[in-house]
Amino acid sequence: VVMQQCGIYVRGRSARLHINYRTTEEIRRWATAVLSGMPGDDLDGEQDALEHYHSLLHGFAPRVRRFATLEEESVFLVQEIRSLCETAIPDTICLVARTHEQLRSHYLPLLRSAGISHLYLDKDTPDYVGSGIRLATMHRVKGLEFAHVLLAGVNAAYVPPRGIAAAGGDLLQAERCLLHVAATRARETLTVTCWGTPSPLLS
């Protein structure tokens, strides 16, 4: 939304803040690359080039792990989550998927069978209630942040959903933005996994 369309005139009175204090430079770069040159909107009717931003923090480069099958991805995720839980508070770890279907069909049963304490953040569940690692959709994690984020099931069938992939245009760009936002929920580490055919947004 351009602010002047809402009756708010800020031209000549606004400043651009180019420093990211939440996530690392390595995660910021990966997430920005997902946007593939898409310009940002500075809310004043002008375009804002995202490459001008930078983070003060540095850390590990995001990892993208591709697997042949869901079973192989599942084994990796359980190992990775258990490893993270050895040094991190479980509440600071979030497994994120594009859809509720993925979470309910694949990842909730996976964590239950592995005996990993977890909390499913649906639309009615506060993120601060209960212990265990968090599970949420990409939409649900908007506005939240976690030390460690695992973006799971980033496959061609789900990211973007088939109808949106076929439509292209603004809908496809919105999916890029959604993946960008989900990735930048991570403060320290970002791990992206997929199985079968990877999402075209990862290329």
Set out the residue ranges of the language-model regions.
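Conserved helicase motor core of SF1/SF2 NTP-dependent helicases
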Residues: 1-179, 189-198
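A conserved SF2-helicase RecA2
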Residues: 200-203
